[in-house]
Swiss-Prot record:
Domain of life assignment: Bacteria
Protein family (similarity comment): Belongs to the type-II 3-dehydroquinase family.
Entry function: Catalyzes a trans-dehydration via an enolate intermediate.
Source organism of the structure: Buchnera aphidicola subsp. Cinara cedri (strain Cc)
Phylogenetic lineage: Bacteria, Pseudomonadati, Pseudomonadota, Gammaproteobacteria, Enterobacterales
Matching HAMAP family: AroQ (MF_00169)
GO aspect biological process, one term: chorismate biosynthetic process
Keywords from the named record: Amino-acid biosynthesis, Aromatic amino acid biosynthesis, Lyase
Name listed for the protein in its UniProt record: 3-dehydroquinate dehydratase
Catalytic-site annotation from UniProt: Y26, H104
Amino acid sequence: MKKKINILLINGPNLNLLGTREPEIYGKKTLEQIVNKIKKKSILLNVTLYDFQSNAEHKIVEKIHNCKKNNIQFILINPGAFTHTSISIRDALSAINIPFFEIHISNIFARENFRSHSWMSDIAQGVISGFGNYGYQIALKTAVKFLLEKEK
């Protein structure tokens, strides 16, 4: 049997409001529905998926800091509005040396000007933006493929 892969999914501020917050941009599914769907997919891929959501920057930083001791091999992060403001989350991701994908439900590059800059994209393994909730599944499948290729 293959070794189990540990992936952490982090969702940032206001993503707890998915389903009711601007459904024309973010869709009608709740964060719980999105996470449940990706957790089902993770089982099929032999992945243990841990999920975490916070509106507090320092809690996200602490969660990232703990990734090494928790044997996390890959991070999927939708930083929400912290994408455009948080150097501390960027620094935390850079410090731990664990690959990550930055995920956005909407296409941040096709929205307001202030949303088009990401403090994390240049250190991310990749950015998945504008695919709606399906972006989470793309990120999960691609992270697994990345880790399996890295093992070869």
